[in-house]
Amino acid sequence: MIRLTQYLQSGVKPALGCTEPGAIAFAVSRACKDLPEDEILESIEVKTSINIYKNGMYVVIPGTNGARGNKIAAALGAICGDPSLKLRALKSCNDSHIEKAKRMIASGKVKLSCLRDKPGVYIDVTVKTRNHAARCVIDGDHTAISLVARDGVIVFKGSQREREEPVFFEGEKFPIDEIIETVERIDAKDVDFIFEGVKMNLEIATYAMNEGISLCKPVKENNNSEEELAIRIKRFCAAASFARMAGVPLPVMSSGGSGNQGIVTILPVAITGKSYGKTREEIAKAIALSHLVLGYIKSRLGKVTPTCGAANAAGPAAAAGIVYMLNGSTEQISQAMSTVFSSTLGMICDGAKEACAYKVGFSGEVAYNSAMLALDKSCVAGPQGVVGKTIEETIENIREISTRTALELENTIIDILEKYNK
C-alpha cells in the first residue's frame, strides 16, 4: 500500500513564489555558506537545465517590488538567502537587499546560462571571492543537492539514493483502488497537514481578490449553482496563481514540485467540498486522492515537461478527487480524467509568469466540469484523438507526444523568450 504520510512529506510542500528561482536562490545560498563571510563576493555563475531557465525567466520574486528572473534570485540568494529554508530561502529579503542585488547584476557579477541538452531539474552554481570558490549542484528535484565543493574539494556529496525521490508508483497501471484504500485510512495528522494546504492556498487567493490585483475580483458566496461554483473555482485558482506569479510574499502549498499544480490539486476539491457540505475528513481524503493521482500522472509524464502541469496533471487529479468525494465510481474517476485530458492537451508551458493564472483558472474550472459530467454519466469516450480506451492508454499517448516533441519545442520556446530578455 502507498504510504500517505511519506508521500505528503515528499511531494506536498510549502513554496514561496515560483519554485524554479526559489531553487536557484537556495543553491546559491548553500554555496555561499562555504565561503568566508568577511570576503567580498566577486562572481556568481549559474547554469541550469532548460526547464529551470525557462520557468524562472519572467516570474516576479516575492518581496522584491516587482524584480523578475533567475539573475535577481541568484543575487539575492548570495546576499540574504537562508539555505535552511530551502525553497523559501529569500523569506527575509528587504529593500536594501534588492538594491544591492540590482547593483551586483548591473556590475556583471551574475552570469546565467542554459544547458539546452540537460533535461529535468538541474542547477549548477559557482560563487567566487578573491581567494575562494564554492560550488553547489542540484539534480533531480528542486531541493536535492547532489554536490557541494569548496576550492575544488568536495564537502558534501549526496548519494543517488538520497537524491532520488521515493518511488510510489511503478509501471503504467493506474492504481486507483490502491489509492482509494490508502486515503480511506487517513489519520488525523495527515488531515491537519492537508488543511494547512487548503488554508495556505485560499489565503493567497483571498488576499489577491481583496487587494484587487489585476484579474483578481471578489467572488460572491451566495450562489451554489453548478455554473456559479465552476466560476468560483476558476477565480480562486486564477487569483492564487496570479498573486504567486506577481510576487505576493505569501506561500502556497505545492504538489509534485509546482505551486500552480498545488493550487489546482487542492482548491477545486476544497471549494466543491465546502459547497456540498462535506466534512473536514471527507474533503481531506479527496484532496489526498488528488495529490496521489497527480503523483501517478507525473510518474508517467515526468516532473517537468513541455506541457502545462497545472492543466495536464493537476486538472485530471482534481477531477478525480471531486468524483471520489461525491461518491462516484472508479470508472467515473477515469472518465473525468480523460475528459480533462481531451480539453487541456494542447496547453504548453512557455515559462512561469502572471499569464499562467489564466491556465490555472481554466484547469480548475475544467476539472470541476469534467467531474460533474462523469457523475452525470457523460464523458469523452475513447478511442478518439489522444483519448485511449483506458486512462492508462490516454496518459501513455500524452507521454509519447511530450517525449517526442520535448527538445524541439523547449528550444523553440527558449529562442522566443530570449528575444525579449536581452
Curated annotation (Swiss-Prot):
An individual GO BP term: L-cysteine catabolic process to pyruvate
Pfam families, per database record: SDH_alpha
Lineage: superkingdom: Bacteria
GO molecular function term, any single one: L-cysteine desulfhydrase activity
Family listed: Belongs to the UPF0597 family.
PANTHER family named among the record's database cross-references: UPF0597 PROTEIN YHAM (PTHR30501:SF2)
The protein's name: UPF0597 protein Kole_0595
Lineage: Bacteria, Thermotogati, Thermotogota, Thermotogae, Kosmotogales
